[in-house]
UniProtKB/Swiss-Prot annotation:
PROSITE patterns in the record: TRP_SYNTHASE_ALPHA
Disulfide cross-links: none
GO molecular function, one term: tryptophan synthase activity
Quaternary structure annotation from Swiss-Prot or TrEMBL: Tetramer of two alpha and two beta chains.
Reactions it catalyzes: (1S,2R)-1-C-(indol-3-yl)glycerol 3-phosphate + L-serine = D-glyceraldehyde 3-phosphate + L-tryptophan + H2O
Organism annotation: Methanocaldococcus jannaschii (strain ATCC 43067 / DSM 2661 / JAL-1 / JCM 10045 / NBRC 100440)
Pfam entry (one): Trp_syntA
EC number(s) on file: 4.2.1.20
Entry annotation: catalytic residues: E49, D60
Gene symbol of the encoding locus: trpA
Protein name as it appears in the record: Tryptophan synthase alpha chain
Length: 281
């Protein structure tokens, strides 16, 4: 049985842990390597977010933009992403998989078809960073129909009224943007992020996971004192970048996977250390 996001958060709560959500672009630098990398990530992450590469990823920083280009150049496409998720679910059904995708990809396939394929591949949720809440009704209804969580992003600039609307439609977890702007690895967790988590907790019981700019274990420890999970993306993708040769392929697969595993394992440990700290509603 493939684990749902709500079940995962319940399991973590019972263990006294917070969620470590790891992001990786499907097909980076090619499908075979990305599958191996994601298998390694699944050993330590609680939830895995798979990016479906897109030619114009507006919410992503340069690191993920480059990863999208590499993946697209290797022939990655949405149908292969479904296959990838399916394979990973056969090996790690207890680690929920979430797609991060831009609306154009969903629109091209057709909303219902896309959500149905998510269900068939065992994808637990979808994040669509460029879909505003005002235009999400149709996709939201298909997600409800097929039992797939629709995860929205909220930012420090999101006013309370809008925040309430988003939280009403959001399921699985809410993606708390730690800084306004684009993704990337930053040095310190901002105070406004902490304020935003408090606001989310005031309006909803949905788990709040913080992403955009989390790159170190210290960040994970700090953020999981107040949030239900930490999302790490660019810092993981940078490991891919570091191991590329001049042709854009992995130089030494073994070394790459070893460094990747050590990094994600260490980040997961950061969600255990502060897990006993209660979240103040």
């Amino acid at each position: 049985m493939i684990m749902k996001l709500a079940e995962k958060f319940e399991e973590l709560k019972n263990k006294g842990e917070k969620a470590f959500v790891a992001f990786y672009v499907g097909g980076d630098p090619n499908l075979e390597i990305s599958e191996k990398a994601l298998e390694v990530i699944c050993k330590h992450a609680d939830i895995v977010e798979i990016g479906i590469p897109f030619s114009d990823p507006v919410a992503d920083g340069i690191t993920i933009q480059k990863a999208d280009v590499r993946a697209l150049n290797s022939g990655m496409n949405p149908l292969k992403a479904f296959e990838l998720a399916k394979k990973l679910n056969e090996k790690a059904p207890n680690v929920p998989k979430v797609f991060l995708t831009y609306y154009n990809i969903i629109f091209k396939m057709g909303e219902e078809e896309f959500v149905k394929k998510c269900k068939e591949a065992g994808v637990s949720g979808i994040i669509v960073p460029d879909l505003p809440i005002e235009e999400a009704d149709s996709l939201y209804n298909y997600c409800k129909k097929y039992g797939v969580d629709l995860i929205f992003l909220v930012a420090p600039t999101t006013p309370d009224e809008r925040l309430k609307k988003i939280l009403e439609k959001c399921s699985g977890f809410v993606y708390v943007v730690s800084v306004t702007g684009i993704t990337g690895a930053r040095e310190k967790v901002a105070e406004e992020t902490k304020e935003l988590i408090k606001r989310v907790k005031k309006f909803s019981k949905i788990p709040a996971c913080v992403g955009f700019g989390i790159s170190k274990r210290e960040h994970v420890e700090e953020i999981t004192e107040i949030a239900d999970g930490a999302i790490v993306g660019s810092a993981i993708v940078k490991i891919v970048e570091k191991h590329l040769d001049e042709n854009g392929q992995i130089k030494d697969e073994e070394k790459f996977l070893k460094e990747l595993e050590e990094f994600v394992k260490n980040l997961k440990e950061g969600t255990k250390k502060k897990a006993k700290v209660a979240i103040k509603n």
